[in-house]
């Protein structure tokens, strides 16, 4: 590889690295909390009609439950989770995932992950408000009716029914376990005066403590991460609870709506896509709300919902249809590599079934990629060897043209063409590896299969190496690889490639997921072995002659 092309490659790699570092080192500052804005008139437009709900027979309004009524709790144990329902709003107080994989450290002790995270000023998920008008989500989210006590009128091991008042309306909610993992069914019946009209608002709040790091290109989303999400029309939209906007109304009929929680998601599915969706900030900093708004037909209606709260397992999400797999967010920088990320996950799943460890699967993936790229790498090294043979001629051209860069570059390109040498041939293996790195990063940041998966001393391949052993080993291997590589004639450039690049990549990898660092480290070891093997098979190249003064 010639000096000019080494500079092009170095500039490309450094440019990508700077973009990565900028996102991590200089994150966007969090704005100061703003008081919620009142909903505008335009946001009170009538929602699209729900899918032909059946109208129940008229009944006398249920008596109101006293505000000081004691809280009643009902536990439903489903496939992979345990849900705790509360009479405060007839809502969901806890959704605790089962299994050793779904744990987090709290005060030094492992506890099961609870997907319900709300501030004390917020209602619980799946609270319902009946309103004369379909107003803003902020009004609904702060409405005392969303936390009004309800009574438990029926319960067994697989279901529970709550009944109470929401304004002038009677609300009856029945939760049922289904046969699917991480799933509840919710039947909702609303009885309201025929003159009331308006609609109901199903609320899904979330809270992220202000000191929670959202993660960046390097660090994945923490367990405490929350972000309102909704599939409306043909788009899946998300809302930043710490952003500038107080609320956002989405266009299009709602397929599902809920809360994005990093490797997990909680979502409400209407029986058929219906209603409208609105995001809003909550009453305290770090809190947010997704509101699914549905119209009432003649003041009363029945609605059916499916509720999913669990891991973002790609295959499982696809069983729901409605583009539910779009709940997996690869992020702005890794989104172009989403296809490759899914392909890598498919391959690693197959490898993991063979070796029963995700760390070993990543090592086998590295070997597989290296084997597939071997013909290209061999051709690249041959091209670099041919470039080294031309180095004496290039030195003569430098002596001839001196500081005239234009003439030197033109003469150099003519020399390459004369000897049929591709000056970019040595760059191709590195350039091809870059998309694989991005795709593997995206896989580690979004695939719950790799979440909390250990390898040797590393307790979780999706976060950084806690002992920094892998980044340091990767830096040493990078140095050795550069040492064995053909060096450019320019001493300053040679020193930069030999010392700066390994040091820079070591710093870069300190906060990168350990799984990605493992891939690059093993790739470096294989590259060193391949270099030694191929250099022994190639004819020796004489040292370049020094340019005459």
UniProtKB/Swiss-Prot annotation:
Any Pfam family from its record, for instance, is YidC_periplas
Q: InterPro entries, alphabetically?
A: Membr_insert_YidC, Membr_insert_YidC_N, YidC/ALB3/OXA1/COX18, YidC/Oxa/ALB_C, YidC_ALB_C, YidC_periplasmic_sf
Q: Which organism is it from?
A: Anaeromyxobacter sp. (strain Fw109-5)
Disordered, as annotated region:
29-68
- Sorted alphabetically, which Gene3D superfamilies does this protein's record hold? 2.70.98.90
- Which cysteine pairs are covalently linked by disulfides here? none
Quote the subunit structure annotation: Interacts with the Sec translocase complex via SecD. Specifically interacts with transmembrane segments of nascent integral membrane proteins during membrane integration.
Sorted keywords for this record are: Cell inner membrane, Cell membrane, Chaperone, Membrane, Protein transport, Transmembrane, Transmembrane helix, Transport
Question: Could you give a GO molecular-function term held by this entry?
Answer: membrane insertase activity
A GO term (biological process) for this protein? Answer: protein transport
Protein name in the entry: Membrane protein insertase YidC
Query: What is its membrane topology?
Result: Multi-pass membrane protein
